[in-house]
Amino acid sequence: MTPLLPDPEHYLYNLIAMTSSDAKRLWRRSIKEHFDYTCVYCGKTYDLSQLSIDHVHPRSRGGKDTLSNVVCACKGCNQDKGSNNWLTWMRAKFGITQREQLILKHIN
């Protein structure tokens, strides 16, 4: 299992990765592992190729590449959410769910 570190740079500092692209790849994989390959939005489990990393607070709106701002999402949910507010989008798409608490716990 890949260790879950705060951001890609920590993989370089801890000599787990030798290049920044390797560090980012390891960081993304560790996030998917942390969420058990399950989309935080729809709650379905996928194989690695169908998952992506979503910025809860989109980078286009000032969100950072930090552990507290990224979650595991299926490509469909990630694309559908786009740069919308995650909570507004999630409630419109799925209603109020227990998964909200999972996300809130992770980002706070």
Language model region names:
Residues 11-12, 19-22, 36-37, 54, ...:
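General secondary-structure edge motif
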Residues 1-25, 45, 96, 101-108:
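A boundary/linker detector
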Residues 17, 58-59, 76:
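General structural signal for alpha-helix termini and helix-helix connectors
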Residues 21, 25, 29, 78, ...:
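Short alpha-helical segments used as structural interaction elements across diverse proteins
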Residues 67-82, 99-108:
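Short Fe-S-cluster ligation motifs
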Residues 41-72, 81-88, 92-93:
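Histidine-centered nuclease catalytic patch
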Residues 22-51, 74:
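Short cysteine-rich loop/turn motifs with clustered Cys
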